[in-house]
């Protein structure tokens, strides 16, 4: 059974980070310039400001997502996942993520949601389309190691 909760525990973050796919670990390393560390990734995202949620399958966390405020009305997403989120629950994870994004707009908390991904994550880029993200720009040299990143956004043009 798939369930969503808006109050993920630190333990949920740790469990997801333990199982995190290699490409997500490499992205975190590229962004931070530090070797991937389960505790660091879990605690860093757990303590980030903004709304967070956890998706559980049979009471085990498979994905944690959230939005970190950048400025009023603008939020940057994050997602920590397990392989099972993609192999067994892709549709549910996508549907829930899209609904959470919609709620950010409907509540008027956001007029812009954005996502930044390492340039090599083509598989992830394909997932962003059903979420409503549009590829916006290449951020040259954005990563700590000098690699490029890609900026995606979803904008509510009716905001005001």
Ranges and model annotations:
Residues 110-129, 142-143:
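Conserved beta-strand-loop-alpha-helix junction that forms the acyl-donor binding cleft
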Residues 49-65:
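Conserved beta-hairpin
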Residues 1-27:
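A short beta-loop-alpha structural element at the N-terminal edge
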Residues 69-79, 111, 148:
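A conserved beta-turn-beta hairpin within the catalytic core of GNAT-like acetyltransferases
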Residues 88-105, 126, 130:
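Conserved acetyl-CoA-binding loop-helix of GNAT-fold acetyltransferases
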Residues 72-93:
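Conserved acetyl-CoA binding element of GNAT-fold acetyltransferases
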Residues 30-50:
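Active-site rim helix/loop that mediates acceptor-substrate recognition in acyltransferases
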Residues 116, 134-149:
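Conserved catalytic-core motifs of GNAT/GCN5-like acyltransferases
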């Amino acid at each position: 059974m798939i369930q969503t909760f808006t109050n993920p525990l630190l333990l949920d973050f740790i469990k997801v980070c333990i199982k995190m796919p290699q490409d997500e670990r490499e992205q975190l390393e590229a962004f931070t310039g530090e070797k991937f560390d389960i505790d660091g990734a879990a605690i860093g995202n757990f303590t980030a400001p903004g709304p967070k949620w956890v998706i559980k399958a049979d009471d085990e966390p498979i994905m944690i997502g959230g939005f970190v405020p950048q400025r009023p009305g603008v939020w940057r997403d994050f997602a920590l996942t397990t392989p099972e989120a993609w192999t067994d629950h892709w549709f549910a994870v996508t549907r829930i993520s899209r609904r959470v994004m919609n709620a950010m707009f409907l509540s008027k908390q956001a007029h812009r949601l954005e996502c930044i991904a390492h340039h090599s994550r083509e598989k992830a880029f394909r997932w962003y389309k059903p979420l409503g993200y549009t590829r916006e720009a290449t951020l040259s040299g954005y990563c700590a190691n000098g690699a490029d990143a890609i900026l995606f956004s979803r904008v509510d043009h009716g905001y005001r």
